[in-house]
Design a protein with these regions (language model features):
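Beta-rich carbohydrate-recognition and catalytic domains
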Residues: 1-103, 108-177
Length: 177
């Protein structure tokens, strides 16, 4: 999936709240990475929305974490759920991150989901913990993100890969006392 500006004439002026473009998430499908189906709107809540991240909680249970990008000064993160990655999705949750947050990424740790996000106007990362994607507990004071880091994704790798990366980091950036 990707987000893009589309011609505003496709939407009403009230939809974009005075902005001269509308942002939506799109997707395509492929079986061979040579030919692709025509692009389709992925999630369209009727207002500018970008930076989606999908979580599969269980069979037929997906959560989309996405940015409400309606107008300058209004960029909040919210969650919607649905029976498949393609939706249809429910009504949005309440916002759970500071205004001016974007680029969400989630990872399951134990019985909680940790959602990380870029609080871009403050030049920092924030995070919340949730079990149900309806109630959120801030955990900013429990995370450490490298200075200058922006949007990111968390992936699982074998421990050997992690150890090799840490060894390479130690060679390239030795600690100074």
């Amino acid at each position: 999936a990707w987000s893009s500006a589309i011609p505003v004439e496709r939407y009403t002026a009230a939809d974009s709240l005075g902005a001269n473009k509308s942002h939506r998430a799109y997707y395509t499908t492929t079986k061979d990475f040579q030919t692709f189906a025509p692009a389709k709107a992925f999630y369209d809540p009727g207002f500018n929305s970008i930076d989606g991240f999908i979580v599969k909680r269980d069979k037929n249970d997906y959560v989309l974490i996405i940015k409400d990008n309606r107008k300058p000064g209004y960029s909040d993160l919210f969650c919607v759920s649905g029976p498949s990655a393609e939706g249809p999705y429910t009504s949005p949750s309440t916002k759970f991150a500071p205004t001016y947050s974007e680029g969400p990424c989630a990872v399951k740790v134990g019985d909680e989901w940790l959602i990380y996000f870029d609080v871009y106007r403050e030049g920092r990362f924030g995070a919340v913990a949730t079990k149900d994607f309806k109630t959120f507990t801030p955990i900013d004071n429990q995370i450490s993100i490298p200075q200058g880091h922006k949007h990111g994704t968390i992936i699982k790798v074998p421990e050997s890969v992690l150890l090799n990366l840490k060894a390479e980091e130690a060679k390239r950036f030795p600690q100074k006392d």
